[in-house]
Amino acid sequence: MASNSGIQWYFDDFEVGQVLQTGSRTVSEAEIIAFATQFDPQPFHVDHDAGAASIFGGVIASGWHTCSMMMRLVVDAFLSQSASMGSPGIEEIRWIKPVRAGDTISVQLTVREVRPSRSKPDRGVILLLWEASNQHGEPVATIKGLGMFGCRPAPSSL
Amino acid sequence: MASNSGIQWYFDDFEVGQVLQTGSRTVSEAEIIAFATQFDPQPFHVDHDAGAASIFGGVIASGWHTCSMMMRLVVDAFLSQSASMGSPGIEEIRWIKPVRAGDTISVQLTVREVRPSRSKPDRGVILLLWEASNQHGEPVATIKGLGMFGCRPAPSSL
């Protein structure tokens, strides 16, 4: 199929131990507050003064905002050029250190498991470890995420 | 502390087996596309026609959008009236069924574990099962989430 020409990552292209590095993304206080106002309006996420007075000593990003920013980095790094068929879920998230206004985060991806589908030979599931760090090299969050990917079409169908 | 008067949920108030029901939230195609354009711009999340042509048969919400909507329901249901000290992480997410434009979701919360902190006697961690379902009663996603909560202040400090 000629329309597959933009796809660089099929299920077949993943190997345990592979490492990929995403680009980076800086988050502003306005973005932190805008996300949290919609989805996680706890005082330490949406209010400058309440954040400063909290145990965190300043506004911090909602953990869901951190995960969503990590997702965008992962989409831009490879998922948008992959045969992604969505995700059945996440095995674990750890929010290690707050993400604060002005922080710049990037993600390192490591392939942990490669599982061909038992019932559908045209696809398989990849377990990826996502490790986000900030501009100081400090870990801020990890995700162990599952992704389903289509297999590379057989040569006869090209 | 008089400023604690708005808090109805301290660590002490959780018991294994407790069930809480959130309100509900309806999501539009415009909201699905707006979220995904920022954080998860895969074709089946951001483009009406690409969604229709995909294995999903229509635009579906990013899994991170579904989790973020669930978070807002949980904040409104009880977290905003709790002694929440944030979350160390998530034990598992399962995206069971796509959330589509026009769907209305609500969440049932069940307390699974109550773990007093070993090192800090003023707090503890709760493991909650979040079960989201749509307007047809179909499960769409589950989250096993950790939350840290402060203990109720001793009477002598009131």
Give short role names for the model-derived ranges.
Chain A
Residues 2-89, 154-158:
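Hot-dog-fold acyl-thioester-processing enzymes
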Residues 1-15, 95-104, 108-158:
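HotDog/MaoC-like acyl-thioester-processing domains
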